[in-house]
Amino acid sequence: MKKILLLFICIFWSTIFQAQSLKLEEIMKGNDFIGNLPENERWSLDGSTIYFDWNPNKEWGNLTYYWKKGMKAPQKASKEEARFSKIRFVEKEGSGIYYYIDKGQLYSYAIKDKKSKKLFQHSVPVSNLQIGKEEGVVYFKQSDNLFKFDTKLGSLVQLTNFKKGKSEEKQKEKESFLKEQQKELFQFVRDQEQKEKWNTANDDAKSDFPKPYFFGKNSIESTKASPKGDFVTFRLREEAEVKQEEMELFITADGYNKFRDTKTKVSTNNFVNTKMGIYNVAKDTVYMVNFSSLSHIQDVPDYFKLYEKNKNLDKKDKLIVAQAPIYNQDGSYAIVEIRSQDNKDRWLVNLNLATGSFKEIEHQHDEAWIGGPGIPSYAFSSGTLGFLADNETIYFQSEITGYSHLYTYNLRTNKKVQLTQGNWEVRGVVLSKDKKTFYLTTNTTHPGNREWYKMNVSDAILQPILTNDGAHEVSLSPDEKTLLVRYSYKNKPWELYWATNKKGSSLNQITFSTTAAFQEYNWRSPEVITFKAQDGTPVNARLYTPNRNQANKAAVIFVHGAGYLQNAHNHWSTYHREYMFHNLLTDLGYTVLDIDYRGSDGYGRDVRTGIYRFMGGKDLSDQIDGKNFLVQNYGVDPNRVGIYGGSYGGFITLMGMLTTPKEFAAGAALRSVTDWAHYNHGYTGNILNFPETDPDAYKKSSPIYFANNLEGNLLMLHGMVDDNVEYKDVVRLSQRFIELGKKKWSLASFPVESHGFKETYSWVDEYGRILDLFNSTLLNK
């Protein structure tokens, strides 16, 4: 009996000590409490040195550090070395000569003697550096035009003569009575006209400078030369006249309020006409690519059938965006990736530069929206795409099986091959220098892991290299023998390691970033559990459970932000303050569940698109199913469950409190979207289509339409200079509550904070209010 009593006392005091050891004022310091973690890791060109950004001494910001094998600890790099390490270099394979742009000027760097040489300097900066097929030839962009620079000869040639506006050619004069009369009466006038025609026809001094091409009011972008420099492709984009949202700043240096443009709201008015053009250098001519023969380019989305106004629409081509071509080594193949602006289609085509015609290689369609790892999620973005060593086979990713996997397509034989398969995703693709081996980041062993595999193109067999639980962010050394690894686990923050590039490698730690204060606490490794949703779909979640003797039968459900994000994983969370807050809540006796609901990242296409046309549908029911799981398995009182989250998590909190008012006793909604018609175009248009074409999707997905249902205790918290989800969102919902006579709500405003809070005092105030809400509404019932 004495032993049992002694054990109870030890557990009691151990629990009390741990609960007292976490304080909001400390954990809300974020990385100042945890330790500032290394990031932006990179190799030197010769592979001898590792560079990364770090702040171990709590300075005002990150500085560049370096490390080499044999060093006991990383050292701070000089300012010049730090700057040089961040430059983007391009190399002609095997030449040992690298080219780069620094402050708008062109340089070369010889790996042999480690010396830089300035090649071109001009008052107008250069950009868009490309390597040509010929040795020593590079291309760059200056203003709107492309130039060819031969570093061996020192010659500079302007390839294009693109000009904004209309042609400067003299407008043809209208014939008039007086003009005709002058020619009729005076020989002098007739002679001058004939002389002008003769001079024009016999101008021996004709320039070989490219003729001007005027692109009007459009913008010109994605300008790119073919490897031989015989063609230049470009994209014209119509300038859309759309209204920008404005945000007011209240706390300013001079005491006067200021206004700032933030974003354009989702709308079909944001659709723009784009055209892909080709400039033929030898023929000095421009022609446009006609994509009207793309398969399914006139198909309308299925949801159109739900609206009477859409049933008899005239057929027309979808608006699309074509990316700059990806070339093989000699430029004999040019592959163009295309995405529709209605978000439903993606094409890959083989473009014939000489004729402007093309052959369609791949068409991908998703009735929700095109996306997933390695696949463009927005009209103006691009996905995984490149050539293998044979110069006739491309590789790309597709979600056709339900998970994003790697494929090849041979342009000569028209043979398509799936290289990877299974209920997991290819998260990242790196091709070796000889273009015969892939290095893949996947989540093969668990959706919440990030592993590193080697795969030879010839056999497509995955060879595991780094497969422990957690996340491995890997940078391959220039000689491909060593791995620079940024690794973390659920309760172990990101650190840098190195490993040999072979099976069974162990990680050798380079950085030690966490503070003594952080290390004093025994941080939980939350269990990643799976429960069944009401429709049978397995749903992953992080579970934090208190000691039995301390459990208070109350629970808090955390809803991560972004929607398409993963948080029930096996590595360190971007929500590190929330992770520490969940430890604090668990110390206080709460059970905490952090759910990867429908719409989350890491689980394939069906989960990714599970929120299509109804945000606040399955993503919310997953929270309720998670609550029921806790009630059935962990002794949680169904009347003592709270919910909170930020951004998308704040939106779900609002939908929970307003559309299922009996489910949650309290909710804290941070930086919440309250009306999706007021959010940005790219993100919202993917999921809900557009307010003009699919208004029903917006109405059933927006909390502001359900304000009358509020019953539980709602706390809203929002930064007043949020340029992502504007403060106006929560102001509009507040006005609805006021007009409807609702009482059980409050709003906390943070005058200097944006979407992601910066100041510790703001974090402390915000989470202090959240903790008070849960303690006052979920306990002592």
Feature map (PLM): residue ranges:
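Bacterial Sec-dependent N-terminal signal peptides
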Residues: 1-23
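Compositionally biased, intrinsically disordered low-complexity segments enriched
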Residues: 8, 160, 184, 362-365, ...
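Prokaryotic Sec-type signal peptides and long signal-anchor helices
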Residues: 12, 16, 56, 88, ...
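Beta-propeller folds
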Residues: 19-462, 469-470, 481-482, 490-494, ...
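Structural signal for short hydrophobic segments within the conserved structured cores
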Residues: 117, 157, 287, 359, ...
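Serine-hydrolase catalytic core recognition
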Residues: 471-781
